[in-house]
Design a protein with these regions (language model features):
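A generic local secondary-structure boundary/capping motif
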Residues: 104-106, 127-132
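Short-chain dehydrogenase/reductase
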Residues: 22, 93, 132
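Conserved "HGTGT" condensation-loop signature of ketosynthase/thiolase-family condensing enzymes
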Residues: 1-51, 55-58, 64-75, 145-183
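Extended hydrophobic secondary-structure segments that form protein cores and membrane-embedded regions
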Residues: 46-48, 85-90, 118
Length: 183
């Protein structure tokens, strides 16, 4: 009796000259819907959790544009009818997990029946010598509720600042076409 992943998709820009975050997210969402055998109109909530967009665009909300592009219940829903609510969730690396938590709660309460989470990131366009080059990527997941499976049932997060000195992270860089990129 929990939230389950109905389908998932992930893709890269496949060599597009100037990939656009919106188009990558559109493609990931459409692929994910196809994997699940669902229609865009089946989606009750669409959350975009991507961070890096071309030209560092912040407005309008990318989720609303993706909703429009894939055709998920456009316009105002009729009174008592079905619609899709969409919004951007900017929570860094935790964005997708936070989106799962939000949609799981709404699935558990019966407010939504199918949730979609998309994320796409492209280089925001601040290329200069030594800049990190992001590989344009996108992903999408569809969440539903299943009475037979445990799925996602509880979420809990906690931070322990007294242990922050135990965390270490790093990247190995290499030169490629005049830019430093992660190996």
């Amino acid at each position: 009796m929990g939230t389950r992943i109905e389908a998932a998709s992930a893709l890269t820009s496949r060599g597009l000259r100037k990939p656009i975050a919106r188009r990558l997210a559109d493609a990931a969402a459409r692929t994910c819907l196809a994997h699940a055998g669902k229609e865009p109109g089946d989606v009750d909530m669409l959350i975009n959790a991507g961070i890096y967009r071309e030209d560092s665009m912040g407005e309008p909300a990318l989720a609303a544009l993706i909703q429009e592009d894939i055709g998920a219940n456009l316009g105002q829903p009729p009174i008592g009818g079905h619609g899709t609510f969409s919004f951007d969730l900017l929570n860094g690396i935790c964005g997708v997990i936070t989106a799962i938590q939000i949609e799981s709660g709404l699935l558990d309460s019966g407010v939504i029946r199918l949730g979609a989470i998309v994320a796409s990131d492209v280089d925001p366009g601040h290329l200069h010598p030594g800049a990190v080059v992001l590989q344009p990527t996108a992903g999408a997941i569809l969440l539903g509720r299943d009475e037979q499976l445990a799925g996602f049932t509880d979420f809990y997060t906690e931070t322990f600042p007294e242990y922050d000195d135990l965390f270490a992270s790093g990247l190995v860089w290499q030169e490629r076409h005049g830019h430093r990129v992660p190996r």
